[in-house]
Amino acid sequence: MRLTPLLVALFGYIYCQETFVGDQVLEVIPNDEEQIKTLLQLEAEEHLELDFWKSPSVPRQTVHVRVPFASIQDVKVFLESQGITYSIMIEDVQVLLDQEREEMLFNQQRERGTNFNFGAYHTLEEIYQEMDNLVAENPGLVSKVNIGSSFENRPMNVLKFSTGGDKPAIWLDAGIHAREWVTQATALWTANKIASDYGTDPAITSLLNTLDVFLLPVTNPDGYVFSQTSNRMWRKTRSKRSGSFCVGVDPNRNWDANFGGPGASSNPCSDSYHGPSPNSEVEVKSIVDFIKSHGKVKAFITLHSYSQLLMFPYGYKCAKPDDFNELDEVAQRAAQSLKRLHGTSYKVGPICSVIYQASGGSIDWAYDLGIKYSFAFELRDTGYYGFLLPAKQILPTAEETWLGLKTIMEHVRDHPY
């Protein structure tokens, strides 16, 4: 049975107060450096309240920007006056949000008394409950490690997959940017995959007999809750500081990796605000402290969306890392493995050359710490839905991502250092 528009509207009122009626996402293609400079100037116009989903970087690479209804005409007229090509990618953002909310409510009704649906988006409480279920159902393999609490005092719970002993480890996190919901969902599916297939799948069994895996499905719990209850487009943490009315820090600009350099903003109201100091965000510091204290983490992998990319250092500079050849070879093989399932193509390379220069990122920090195998995935899609990927794409996204992850993990297993 389909939900009535009234129920969907009520759900939106309760769970997502900010609406985006009439907002459009434009795909813009700058032809040269001058047009990129123009788009960067446009991005700085705070009164337009533009939300760049894919920022300007190099000529002829697409830029995606959500434009509020009130600014649409001004932005389009400006682009046309500058000779910058654009097209409408999403006609009305609110239409996709309404569909997403309807699916969530329908799933919540359907899940009562039934098994957890990994092909749906869930609240933080539902995710944490399923993590507890995985621990309870697999006591000899899965345990829960609390590495700290968020700014709003929500637990940061990591799932540890281990067969015992003091093994080297792989770190995997998701959801550092709140609105990238397919990443949290993919991470939870991955956790269930590892737990359910150990002992029957030779690849997973071999991996866990050699390595531990630490998996943090929701790296930014405060932001994730806020994206579900107040503003679906929220990206940052929810930290507050005296002297600023703007809330939050971009947690993937807050790491001690050329902190405050190119690609990060000093403006507290920016979605790319790097924060007052490295590791100022408790969510970031909790991970830093845990990984440093563990001392044997050999791979650091983070899941983002969207754009279908598999990247490695560096982001804060455009120089190749010392291990470029090996990292590129591993990433290329992982992308090929991923593609075999559904034909999904990924672009591979260092962050700086694949997207843009960005300082203070997690995998740069990990690599500079000595964790050689540091990778960032940008999951589906390439922009048709952007951050609003329909729930029906969660399972195929998770399934193909696992093949890429497994390729990297097997390389880490076979190349100890």
From Swiss-Prot:
Q: Which GO terms describe its molecular function?
A: metallocarboxypeptidase activity; zinc ion binding
Main enzyme class: hydrolase
**What does the record say about how the cofactor binds?**
Binds 1 zinc ion per subunit.
Tell me where on the tree of life, at the top rank, the source sits: Eukaryota
Cofactor list: Zn(2+)
For whether the record's keyword set contains Plastid, the answer is: no
Can you tell me which residues bind substrate?
Answer: 177-180, 235, 252-253, 305-306, 356
Provide the Gene Ontology terms for cellular component: extracellular region
Places the protein is found: Secreted
EC number(s) per UniProt?
3.4.17.15
Alphabetized UniProt keyword annotations: Carboxypeptidase, Disulfide bond, Hydrolase, Metal-binding, Metalloprotease, Protease, Secreted, Signal, Zinc, Zymogen
Report domain Peptidase M14 positions: 120-412
Q: Which InterPro entries match?
A: CPA_M14_CPD, M14A-like_propep, M14A_act_pep, Peptidase_M14
> Which family, according to the similarity comment?
Belongs to the peptidase M14 family.
Its biological purpose is as follows: Carboxypeptidase that catalyzes the release of a C-terminal amino acid, with a preference for large aromatic C-terminal residues.
Q: Under what name is this protein listed?
A: Carboxypeptidase A2
Q: Write down the species.
A: Mus musculus (Mouse)
**Which gene is this protein's source?**
Cpa2
